[in-house]
Regions:
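Alpha-helical transmembrane bundles and membrane-interface segments of multipass inner-membrane proteins
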Residues: 1-153
Length: 153
């Protein structure tokens, strides 16, 4: 359920940004020296890796990402730990948001440019942030020992 809500939120945010702000040219400073609105299309996966050109590459990438999203969704469904389930839910929600972009636009619409002054870091979107936050929650759950006798109900 969490994944569906996050996917819808990511989808709506991406569509709003894409259709309302993408018509404006250039960047918009959101947080001076740190974060700008800077729209771009990412034809690859993370950081432009596995850049695909053409319909066959896009279809293969969509199929692989759909299978991986399904597996992570299954892990969320099986989890009895709320922190872990929330992490998996964020990962699935973000993945589905990006999958929607890739399936219907041919690429992922990234629009948040993170930088430290003149040092460029990366461009991402809300879905990417959800995936990263989910991965962080999963790592915290794995690294922080559970209290003996504690239950997660």
């Amino acid at each position: 359920m969490l994944a569906a809500g996050l996917a819808i939120g990511a989808l709506l945010l991406n569509l709003a940004i894409e259709h309302v702000l993408a018509g404006a040219r250039g960047s918009l400073v959101l947080v001076p020296g740190l974060l700008d609105y800077s729209p771009t299309w990412n034809h690859g996966v993370s950081f432009g890796l596995f850049w695909q050109n053409g319909d066959t590459g896009r279809r293969v990438l969509i199929a692989v990402l759909a299978v991986v999203s399904g597996f992570v969704g299954y892990m969320a469904w099986r989890s009895t730990n709320r922190l872990q389930a929330a992490g998996y839910g964020l990962v699935v929600g973000g993945a589905l948001g990006n999958l929607w972009d890739r399936a219907f636009s041919g690429a992922v619409f990234d629009y948040l440019f993170l930088h430290l002054g003149q040092i460029s870091l990366f461009v991402f979107n809300f879905s990417d942030a959800a995936i990263s936050a989910g991965a962080l929650l999963i790592m915290i759950d794995a690294l922080v020992p559970a209290k003996v006798g504690a239950t997660d109900s």
